[in-house]
């Protein structure tokens, strides 16, 4: 698929989760929304070698929008930079929660609460509905059962305003 926006990060918790055999687990609302969009690419070094690109593309496939570079960090793709940003935001939040949950249970994955297959299926259906609504430019707020996920553009603008307020516009652009 064509990609307009791409976002790569070395976010601490996302990089840490990329170093685990489990990858991103469907244990938080954020991770359940994205887990079916994730593909993995084995570590080959610093990812600067042009010959690695075809292998990365093959591992990503035509349907996935998130590529976890193992032992490195996530890369998200979107129809816009806002789409790619929102996916990265969800990846990083998922990894934050997972890192804390894994630490809380001493790494014993059997002690983590994983939603039932029925809940995962319902959330997957809701996430699919949200994606279709955003593509059509429709609202996906709580009023129509969308779960309150705002559009990627609104999230991106809100985060940009937060950064401007925190650091000053001259420091972030």
Give the location of each predicted region.
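Glycine-rich flexible loops
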Residues: 1-173
């Amino acid at each position: 698929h064509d990609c307009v926006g791409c976002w790569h990060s070395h976010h601490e918790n996302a990089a840490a989760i990329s170093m685990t055999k489990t990858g991103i687990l469907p244990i938080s609302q954020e991770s359940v929304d994205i887990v079916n969009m994730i593909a993995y690419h084995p570590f080959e070094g610093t990812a600067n070698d042009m010959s690695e690109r075809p292998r990365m593309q093959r591992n990503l496939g035509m349907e996935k929008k998130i590529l976890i570079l193992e032992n490195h960090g996530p890369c998200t793709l979107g129809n816009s930079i806002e789409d790619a940003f929102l996916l990265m935001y969800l990846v990083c939040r998922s990894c934050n929660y997972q890192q804390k949950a894994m630490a809380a249970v001493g790494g014993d994955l059997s002690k983590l609460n994983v939603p039932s297959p029925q809940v995962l299926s319902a959330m997957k259906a809701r996430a699919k509905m949200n994606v279709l609504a955003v593509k059509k430019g429709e609202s996906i707020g709580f009023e129509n059962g969308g779960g309150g996920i705002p559009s990627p553009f609104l999230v991106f603008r809100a985060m940009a305003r937060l950064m401007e307020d925190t650091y000053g516009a001259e420091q972030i652009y």
